[in-house]
Amino acid sequence: MKRLLIAMVGLVLFCACAGTAPAQNGRGAAELKLNGKAVSVDYGRPALKGRQVEDMLGQLPAGEVWRLGADKSTTFKTATDLVFGDVTVPKSEYSLWARKEADNSWKLVFNKQHGQWGTDHDASQDLPGIPLKETKPATPAEQVTIGLTKTGDGGEITIGWGDMELSTDFKAK
């Protein structure tokens, strides 16, 4: 009887504690093929939940990075060398970030470290920043959305959240 009581108390405690783990956001992914080689991104999808993206990202000081998602860092994989303007991104796996500039513009940052928690950014592992174009989307995005779209002989990466959309073009080298 004593063992049964201990087992029941243990089960109740286990069930009570199981509900207190922090909820993780859903994950999103996008992929495209360039010259038969895969380019992909995997990211966390935080939701605004009634908040404004300007209020949240507006607090980020110039020179700091946004992890482009939630939870585990956003992962970008490419099986071919890519060219973003004058920046070459060699085929590899990276964590992906956006750095806020002093003029409130954004730069896309590929970091050689990947798989880390989304707040563990080592700037010494960054490739040069790539300017992002900011526009207003036709429809605001409640959750962070990252898309890869084929355009001619290259592609476009688009990052949307709320009424902000960031994008840049790239080509296979």
Question: What is each of the regions a protein language model found here?
Answer:
Residues 7-16:
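Bacterial N-terminal signal peptides
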Residues 8, 34, 84:
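Short glycine/serine/threonine-biased micro-segments
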Residues 17-30, 80-81, 88-92:
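Short, charged N-terminal helix-start/capping segments
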Residues 21-64, 114-173:
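Primarily secretory-pathway and cell-envelope proteins
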Residues 67-116:
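Mid-length scaffold segments of soluble, non-membrane domains
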